């Protein structure tokens, strides 16, 4: 039977001051490592470091929804990853249409290694893709690894 290890990097809600905001790491037995939600600020880096999970180990991010306590750490995750692995492929980000709108706004609002963003990807100042967007729909299945599939469902909060 397939196994999966789940590490909680944050379980706090938007108003939480004592807990990092929502972020979870799924390590699947096919080698797929998936970050679900990116918390806020540098919480993923701090909590991940405590558990031996470096930010640069993420190649795939799935954002549950567009609230800042679930996705505002995205820019920091891709920035730290790009510093540690400058030649790595783009960070694959799976998100809803509404979350994509907010992700593009976040890219425009800060300059952590992103010079431009459109509905396909975010690029650095050299024109290199640093994040690639995949919009997902409710009831869609998304292949994330050799034996890892995500099943998307309508949700306004997790």
Where on the chain are the PLM-derived regions?
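Binuclear metal-dependent hydrolase catalytic cores
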Residues: 1-158
């Amino acid at each position: 039977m397939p196994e999966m290890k789940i590490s909680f990097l944050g379980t706090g809600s938007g108003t939480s001051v004592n807990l990092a905001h929502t972020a979870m790491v799924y390590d699947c037995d096919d080698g797929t490592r998936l970050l679900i939600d990116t918390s806020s600020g540098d919480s993923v880096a701090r909590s991940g470091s405590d558990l031996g999970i470096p930010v640069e180990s993420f190649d795939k991010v799935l954002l549950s929804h567009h609230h800042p306590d679930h996705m505002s750490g995205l820019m920091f995750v891709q920035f730290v990853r790009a510093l540690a692995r400058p030649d790595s492929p783009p960070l694959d980000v799976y998100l809803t249409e509404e979350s994509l709108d907010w992700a593009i706004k976040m890219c425009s609002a800060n300059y952590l290694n992103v010079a431009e963003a459109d509905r396909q990807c975010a690029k650095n100042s050299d024109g290199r893709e640093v994040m690639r967007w995949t919009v997902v729909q409710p009831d869609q299945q998304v292949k994330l690894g050799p034996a890892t599939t995500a099943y998307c469902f309508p949700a306004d909060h997790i």
